[in-house]
Amino acid sequence: MNAIWIAVAAVSLLGLAFGAILGYASRRFAVEDDPVVEKIDEILPQSQCGQCGYPGCRPYAEAISCNGEKINRCAPGGEAVMLKIAELLNVEPQPLDGEAQELTPARMVAVIDENNCIGCTKCIQACPVDAIVGATRAMHTVMSDLCTGCNLCVDPCPTHCISLQPVAETPDSWKWDLNTIPVRIIPVEHHA
């Protein structure tokens, strides 16, 4: 019985010693991240879709900050994200990249044919923004307001019941061009 307690104590002391060494090493040799990269990464939509030419949002943020990559390549984020990054970096806003511009006018969302869905959860695992809900062996559905249209859920589906469809434009989703209507400011005099 004494041998068991000695072994337990020895393993516990070794675990404590190695934990202390790892804790010290993590603080001593810590590498600080670039705060600009962190801020750009927070602005990006985190869809990890790869439409910008990078494998995810973090590598694209690093390329913008460190390599001077264009700020207009995020198709899911569109113009709103580009304007926020331009404001953060204090640079001139750029028109959307040609590839991104082609993708942004017709916003696409995933639609699941629920009659053919077998509930395998492969689409849920593939979705980077958790826009698909459902349980194992039950039909799944897409929350269209969260879907970025990244197309990552289509290929894993074994029954091919997922397709991307354009979102119908409404007054809320329409991109209004406010520069086409000239607006003149009329001074108002207040009389007391």
From Swiss-Prot:
Protein's job: Part of a membrane-bound complex that couples electron transfer with translocation of ions across the membrane. Required to maintain the reduced state of SoxR.
InterPro entries for this protein: 4Fe-4S_dom, 4Fe4S_Fe-S-bd, 4Fe4S_Fe_S_CS, 4Fe4S_Ferredoxin_RnfB, Elect_transpt_cplx_RnfB/RsxB, RnfB/RsxB_Proteobac
GO molecular function: 4 iron, 4 sulfur cluster binding; electron transfer activity; metal ion binding
EC numbers on record: 7.-.-.-
Protein name: Ion-translocating oxidoreductase complex subunit B
Superkingdom field: Bacteria
One GO-annotated biological process of the protein: electron transport chain
Region of interest: Hydrophobic: 1-26
Residues the entry annotates as binding [4Fe-4S] cluster 1: C49, C52, C57, C74
